[in-house]
């Protein structure tokens, strides 16, 4: 049975100390539990941020593309040109076609080989408008015409460095022209030139079937100028 007797002051005081000690211990344990909960919350939040960062990086990596650039240097002249990769969407069919005809025309007009001169001469005439064709034919009637100047002992080789279609029927072609002795003796002489060409298609003129095979689109140069590139020795 419970003791019905009241507690003495000393007993009451001792009991208060015991209850206070129990309350302090409970409070301490509660604070520790709260602190541990906060620590775990921060840890999980940091882990979530790290995971999201890794996912973002993994998602973005395929979007990063390294485009290689190859610098090609012409051995004889030292001319440098950039060779790059390109996607088909970077160029329209019209641009590619214009560049094709521009480079074909310039190469045929600027090179010289005694054994193929007639072929190049006829090809340049075919791809030239009347005024340009007349000027070209006249150049072969002059005393310093290429066939008289070089004869069979010299060749002029052409290497295209770049071709730019500026739109509205105008383009520029940059090229290296190298002069060599036909027998391979002697040092080669190279120089860099820029041809500025105006052109058009489907001009109303009569072409034979053989000519149409060589020039199916009726490409015709309406203006032609070639200049030595500035800054050469």
Curated annotation (Swiss-Prot):
It is found in: Cell inner membrane. One of its GO terms (cellular component) is plasma membrane. Its main location: membrane. It is a single-pass membrane protein. The chain crosses the membrane at residues 42-62. Keywords: Cell inner membrane, Cell membrane, Membrane, Transmembrane, Transmembrane helix. It comes from the Bacteria. InterPro entries: NTF2-like_dom_sf (IPR032710), VirB8 (IPR007430), VirB8/PtlE (IPR026264). One of its GO terms (biological process) is protein secretion by the type IV secretion system. It holds the Pfam family VirB8. CDD domains: VirB8. B.bronchiseptica strain Bb55 harboring a functional ptx-ptl promoter from B.pertussis produces the PtlE protein in a stable form. Is also able to produce and secrete efficiently the pertussis toxin (PTX). Belongs to the virB8 family. This is Type IV secretion system protein PtlE homolog. It comes from Bordetella bronchiseptica (strain ATCC BAA-588 / NCTC 13252 / RB50) (Alcaligenes bronchisepticus). The gene is ptlE.
